[in-house]
Swiss-Prot record:
Lineage of producing organism: Eukaryota, Viridiplantae, Streptophyta, Embryophyta, Tracheophyta
TM stretches of this protein: none
Keywords associated with the record: Chromatin regulator, Nucleus
Protein's job: May be required for replication-independent chromatin assembly.
Record-given protein name: Ubinuclein-1
Main localization (coarse): nucleus
Domain of life of the native organism: Eukaryota
Organism annotation: Arabidopsis thaliana (Mouse-ear cress)
Annotated knockout phenotype: No visible phenotype.
Keyword Nucleus: yes
Family the UniProt entry places it in: Belongs to the ubinuclein family.
Compartments it resides in: Nucleus; Nucleus, Nucleolus
Chain positions covered by the region annotation Disordered: 108-137, 157-287, 311-332, 609-631, 660-684
Compositionally skewed regions (Polar residues) per UniProt: 211-235, 261-284, 311-321, 611-631, 669-684
GO CC terms: nucleolus; nucleus; rDNA protrusion
Length: 684
């Protein structure tokens, strides 16, 4: 049974049909005749049908029609049979290019087209069994290997054969395109492949480390001679060769041995990195020889038997330079660790123990302006100074550690700002100390010159002495020891304090150098370092005694002030007695002096006045003793005085018209009022 299928350019994709179709043309349309077989499913592809029809019909079907607007003169010159020959000669040329294109497509896309319509050449699970252990998968694995090495030539190219690469192949048996296998079980060869994969990975990791290490190694060991470089680089190269041999032998072993070689390669890598780090630190720790040359030059400076200023200050600067260069026996790291531990101790002591975690969270959330305690600030400045001297800058690790210590007191940006300020202040302080040190040293030199000249003048031959006595007197200054006064000892003590203030560690050897340098300021070896040491100790003892006396005097003045403040409170009960005396003096301002010629009535009135005043005194005493407040006492006294004066005025007004001969004379305030009653037995 056969049918004619009419199609206008559409396509139905599917399996290829073996029978060649017949092409029938009708105007612009093409008719293809396809044979249909009963019992089979027929898949028709338009492209495949057109290709097969072109092959069957031959070259005549592909002959192009002449263009409608061709040149008539050109057609007139060409014979009528010639165009067919030319066209037939040109057709194989076009077919040749088509064949090349199809070949390239088959090479890169497979044997068939990549439109997904034809699947004749696609492998199926039924055709290739990946589980079969008898089939050798070496070629398949090689095809799916991924090579990560760099190619020697760049650009677009078509190469036949194996590509040239910069490094030996470090491929790993990765198979991204291969289909997954149904079962996870693998034969013995797969285990060997996995071991090879581990070894290759370890080799690539080690080669990467080696590729990065030589650059840094060259930069670090540039100041060393070539012999030292060869000696140092021979160790890691031997390690690399040894690890390569071990990895090469492990390819023929089991997976367990391959794991052991991988661990050994990791150990070799750690060892090589450690050796590089140690050699770099040893190179950084070396100091240039210029420092020692400066020290020797400074010690040789003399002027007329007396060392100048550079002798003392040079030793101090050389010691600081040696510390900066790392030539100390103790490293700066240990000093820095010690300073950080001291800071932790001070922070723990200054931190109040009653603060809980919740309270800390509340205070940290609030924008409270916090200030560092003075002790914490001093220790932090010491840490900043040591870190600047040893590292040259403050590393992130150091700042994080300081924040873990003082983070509850200060923020991160404030800590960085304070560290910078402390370093700047430390530099300015060191400059000020150096200038002050030089100034005091010059003063000491002047004092020594004056003292030595005085000693020489005293040692000169006195009047009337012989020549032998003169020779003895000349030799006396060399035998006589120099005696210091208190002012010179104080100056030396000031030099000692300034010198010690800048030292962090190893004060013993440095102070001894200071003693020796100061002793060399005296001519003819009149002073040794022990004398300098004893003089400084004597000055310190005097200062301690002076400070102790001042402290005692200040304590005594404080005690006196406190006693004066406590006197009004303690003498509150005794105050009424003094007030009582004053009251008595005021009450007795006016004393009645009785005339012997007066009558008895005036005497009686004066007696009554005295009795009334005597009765008022206990009342005043009761009022004063009841209240210790001075303001209340003055108010009560004023009121009672006013009442007494009013009574006196009334009595005097009554007595004036009756007895004009009596006189009232005011008594002075200093006189005491007699407590005894007057004698009433007057003469008749």
């Amino acid at each position: 049974m056969s049918e004619v299928n009419e199609m206008s350019g559409g396509s139905i994709g599917g399996e290829l049909l073996r029978a060649s179709p017949k092409v029938l043309t009708a105007g612009d349309r093409k008719l293809l005749k396809v044979e249909l077989r009963p019992g089979d499913t027929t898949y028709v592809s338009w492209k495949k049908l057109m290709r097969d029809a072109g092959k069957v019909n031959g070259l005549s079907a592909s002959v192009p029609d002449p263009p409608p607007n061709a040149n008539p003169n050109l057609e007139f010159r060409i014979a009528p049979g010639h165009p067919v020959e030319i066209e037939t000669n040109e057709q194989p040329h076009s077919n040749r290019f088509n064949a090349v294109i199809e070949k390239i497509e088959r090479l890169y896309k497979g044997n068939d087209s990549s439109d997904g319509e034809e699947l004749d050449g696609a492998p199926d699970d039924d055709e290739y069994d990946t589980e079969d252990s008898f089939i050798d998968d070496a070629e398949l694995d090689e095809y799916f290997e991924v090579d990560n090495s760099t190619v020697k030539h760049d650009g677009f190219y078509v190469n036949r054969g194996k590509l040239e690469r910069m490094e030996p192949s470090t491929t790993s048996n990765q198979q991204p395109k291969k289909r997954r296998r149904k079962d996870s079980a693998k034969p013995c060869r797969d285990a060997v492949d996995v071991s090879d994969k581990h070894t290759k990975l370890s080799i690539t990791a080690r080669k990467k480390d080696q590729s990065t290490a030589p650059g840094s190694w060259k930069t670090q060991e540039s100041p060393l001679p070539s012999g030292a470089q060869d000696a140092n680089t021979s160790v890691p190269l031997d390690d690399v060769k040894h690890s390569d041999r071990a990895n090469h032998q492990s390819r023929n072993d089991t997976s367990h041995k391959s794991r052991e070689t991988g661990s050994s390669s990791a150990l070799h890598q750690k060892y090589s990195n450690k050796s590089l780090h140690q050699q770099s630190t040893s190179l950084l720790g070396k100091s240039p020889p210029n420092v020692f040359a400066e020290v020797t030059v400074v010690r040789q400076k003399e002027n007329n038997g007396m060392h100048q200023l550079a002798n003392v200050t040079g030793s101090r600067q050389s010691s600081q330079a040696s510390k900066k260069d790392g030539s100390n026996v103790k490293s700066k790291t240990s000093i820095l660790e010690k300073a950080i531990r001291e800071l932790e101790k001070v922070v723990v002591e200054s931190r109040p123990p009653a603060i809980t975690e919740n309270q800390e969270a509340d205070t940290s959330s609030q924008a409270v302006k916090r200030r560092l305690p003075r002790d914490v600030k001093l220790k932090l400045a010491k840490v900043a100074r040591i870190a600047q001297a040893s590292q040259g800058k403050h590393s992130t690790e150091l700042i994080n550690r300081l924040m873990s210590i003082v983070g509850h007191l200060i923020q991160l940006r404030s800590l960085k700002r304070n560290l910078k300020i402390m370093i700047d202040m430390g530099d300015s302080a060191t400059r000020e100390k150096d200038t002050r040190f030089k100034q005091i040293n010059n003063e000491v030199l002047d004092m020594i010159k004056a003292k030595v000249s005085l000693m020489e003048s005293q040692a000169i031959k006195p009047e009337g002495a012989t020549s032998d006595d003169f020779q003895d007197s000349v030799e006396k200054p060399s035998l006589k020891k120099f005696v210091m006064d208190a002012a010179l000892e104080d100056k030396l003590c000031d030099l000692y304090d300034i010198f010690i203030d800048g030292l962090d560690e190893d004060q013993g050897p440095q102070t001894k150098k200071l003693y020796v340098n100061l002793a060399e300021l005296w001519p003819n070896r009149l002073m040794d370092y022990r004398g300098i040491k004893h003089a400084i100790f004597r000055a310190k003892e005097r200062r301690k005694a002076l400070y102790g006396n001042l402290a005692k005097e200040m304590d005594q003045t404080k005690m006196k002030k406190s006693m004066k403040q406590l006197v009004p409170r303690t003498d509150c009960t005794a105050q009424p007695n003094t007030e009582l005396v004053v009251q008595r003096q005021h009450s007795g301002e006016k004393k009645l002096i009785v005339d012997p010629n007066a009558t008895s009535t005036s005497v009686v009135t004066s007696q009554t006045m005295v009795d009334r005043s005597n009765q008022q005194q206990p009342e005043k005493l009761k009022g004063i003793s009841s209240s210790c407040n001075p303001t209340e006492e003055t108010r009560v006294v004023k009121r009672k005085n006013e009442a007494v004066m009013a009574e006196k005025q009334v009595v005097l007004a009554l007595k004036k018209p009756e007895h004009p001969q009596t006189r009232v004379i005011p008594a002075p305030q200093n006189l005491n009022i007699p407590r005894t009653t007057p004698d009433l037995n007057l003469p008749s």
